[in-house]
Amino acid sequence: MTTALDQLKQYTTVVADTGDFQQLAQYKPQDATTNPSLVLKAVQKDEYKPLLEKTVRDHASKPVGSIIDNLLIAFGTEILKIVPGRVSTEVDARLSFDTKASIDKAHELIKMYDAQGIGRERVLIKLASTWEGIRAAEVLQKDGIKCNMTLLFSLAQAVAAAEAGAQLISPFVGRIYDWYKKNAGSNWDEARDGGANDPGVQSVRRIYAYYKKFGYPTEVMGASFRTTSQILELAGCDLLTISPDLLQKLHDSNDRIERKLSPEASRNADIERVPTDEASFRFLVNDDAMATEKLSEGIRVFAADAIKLEKVIEALR
């Protein structure tokens, strides 16, 4: 019997969302994604202490920010020994509103990968989907550096990223679901509001349909899943990045998977073009309470975890 994970791979490129690279091989993902929170979680495990300690030791004379960059590269390098495709490495969230600093940091990260013998075609630079982050991606893409736009919660962000020529976007399914469930309170009905009606699932479907209808080549990678149901409702999406625990659940399941998204079905979608000038972008994101709150919260969380990672490193110096 074919596993649900293997069936999903027939329709969608499966990506592993983890810094715990020792778990990767068993699921055979094509790509992998990381972020400061995942790396922070990984370095707290005993099996990654040697990599952390070696990185700190080898770069002890450098500023702590540089050591973090080297740690991200060390994790990315190990991941690329396992996955045949690409790894996503994130620019410090504290640069989310600084276009030039984001561009400079992306070039630094690519240069560091190059020093490890890893070509830029195997790396995606993750940037927050702020106006400034999207502008950074526009420049970087023209420089041949491929970008993964993260912390994406709205169609306005997705369209602006595609217009900027971003290689890939990561709309956050689970965090959208969390927001609507929390705000609904006792009115939330999982049977009614989950599954195909899940607000996070619907958001990704809308973005996917928009891209396919209007011919954008930017890849759509659903991210931030809470359940296997959310994943299976997006079977057929270009890519899905999935945590090891949910990959395991899919691996253990033999349920039959059906394709839910396809370019052909999306071309006739009832959807209008979205303006992408700065004023329209800022208004549309501001007008979406969920997108506004989750974007700002996401930046705060990633920034806080970067600071925690700095403290872990400082304690070893």
UniProtKB/Swiss-Prot annotation:
KW Cell cycle (keyword) present: no
The entry's keywords: Cytoplasm, Pentose shunt, Schiff base, Transferase
InterPro entries: Aldolase_TIM, TAL/FSA, Transaldolase_1, Transaldolase_AS
Subcellular compartments: Cytoplasm
Coiled coil: none
Catalytic reactions on record: D-sedoheptulose 7-phosphate + D-glyceraldehyde 3-phosphate = D-erythrose 4-phosphate + beta-D-fructose 6-phosphate
Chief site of localization: cytoplasm
GO cellular component: cytoplasm
Subunit structure, as described in the record: Homodimer.
Protein name listed in UniProt: Transaldolase
Gene source species: Paraburkholderia phymatum (strain DSM 17167 / CIP 108236 / LMG 21445 / STM815) (Burkholderia phymatum)
High-level lineage: Bacteria, Pseudomonadati, Pseudomonadota, Betaproteobacteria, Burkholderiales
Gene designation per UniProt: tal
